[in-house]
Amino acid sequence: MPEVSERNQHGITGLGHVLTPGEIDVSHGTILYLEDVMVSFDGFRALNKLTLSIDVGELRCVIGPNGAGKTTMMDVITGKTRPDSGKVFLGQTFDLTRMSEPVIARTGIGRKFQKPTVFENHPVWENLELAMKTNKGWLASLRSKLDRAAQARIEETLELTHLERDAMRYAGELSHGQKQRLEIGMLLMQQPALLLLDEPAAGMTDHETMQLADLLNKLRGTCSMMVVEHDMEFVAALSGDTGRVTVMAEGSVLAHGTLDEVKRDEKVIESYLGR
């Protein structure tokens, strides 16, 4: 059997022990792999031989014009859309094209849409508690007692998301940016192997955007992430000088490299940045 390491608190595996059933094999250092993925809707080719990979612990920003196929790509990864052809693997273990959407979610892929989804009539603490107990109904979850380790995880997540002072506030009272961070915290409570974030900075103030960038940068290296975004300042805050950025256009990868490299690419300027 291939050898991989134990998962850390965010669900990542690496080198170290014998692979057990249900565990993600990332012994080659790759958490997500897509090859020649094709998707068509009524004759329109949404994805056209899309090929890309994401390393374990990487924070990958994906940019591109509207209609480039970014959302369709996420739909394929999460099982919402079935590709016409191509390969989509989580690590070397799971062929996502053969799995249903609920099974993929349980396997370790968390997705955050642009609009935050939280339990507005429950306090922040209970939102995190409910997210951690996804195998139970919400009422049973609230009635069951947390052990000390679970309480510590919630406290750590509150601190990480800068919501420790808002733990007892109802989620509906939070600002838009706070709700976005809360939902990311809820996803982290499920210990995902990969987080997909679709325009998480949309609608945020500049201060909230930088708070979110700080949160995601803290997760870099411990949680693999794909961030689809249009806000180039936010992308710059996430990618820095060395982070990799993928530019999509017409359903495939147009360019790939550091942010400075893709911004100088003539194809990118013509297709996206120059518009």
Regions found by a protein language model. Give the residues of each.
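Conserved ABC ATPase "signature" region
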Residues: 22, 141-166, 214, 224
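The feature captures the beta-strand-to-loop junction immediately N-terminal to the Walker
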Residues: 63-65
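Helix-to-loop junction immediately C-terminal to a conserved catalytic motif
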Residues: 78
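ABC ATPase NBD Q-loop/coupling interface
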Residues: 87-106, 146
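Conserved ABC ATPase signature
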Residues: 170-174
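Catalytic Walker B motif of ABC-type/P-loop ATPase nucleotide-binding domains
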Residues: 195-199
